[in-house]
Amino acid sequence: MFELSPKKAVINDCNKELMNVYKCIKDEKKFEAMCRELNHHETEHSEEYYYEIRNLDRDKRKFNKLADYKRAARTIYLNKACFNGLYRVNSKNEFNVPFGKKTKVNTYDIGNLITVSNYLTMNDIKILNVDFEDSVKDAQKGDFIYFDPPYDSETSIFNSYTEDGFGKEEQRRLAKVYKELSNKGCYVMLSNNNTTLI
């Protein structure tokens, strides 16, 4: 999307923490606070510190009271410091990827983040955290829509980007929505495995 740089767009994902990152990057004060927090994470980085930050979501009441910018910095830090940059949660929506064994971690490229922040703030960009079907309900002929769901796989059951997962039924529902949008005259694109399911 950033390569195309549309003046008006909707960004949607079922991952609440990811969408919070985008919202913080779009908000100047939260963006600055998030960068300070990322610097702190880089300074404190160790295996013990990683698990301390990772386990913040075990106490839901406390975690839900964390400032948005702290949650955003946590998401970015965990992504950079965890094993293989994997995002995975369990059925309780707790991030559960092990430490990535890096002794030093670079959590962000300030130039890149400033470019993204400027793009999000200078254009009409809506950031949503809703079901994919709800995110496209107002789509009109000529709109370009890109879907990037967890890939369907015959050999892997991993789809735990959220506590609810994204299974076979969601894949079928997405295929139906895709066809409806295409029939409406939208330009629709989807990334997935070459699967017999859909």
List the model feature ranges, each with a label.
Residues M1-E42:
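Conserved S-adenosyl-L-methionine
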Residues Q171-I198:
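Conserved Class I SAM-dependent methyltransferase catalytic core
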Residues Y22, I76, V188:
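A residue-level signal for conserved active-site and pocket-lining positions in enzyme catalytic cores
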Residues F2-S5, K137-A139, I198:
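Short loop/helix-cap segments at secondary-structure boundaries that form the rim of catalytic
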Residues S160-G165:
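Short glycine-enriched, charge-decorated loop/helix-capping segments at active-site entrances
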Residues K7-K8, M122-I125, S182-V188:
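Short active-site oxyanion
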Residues G167-E169:
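Charged helix-capping and loop-helix junction motifs
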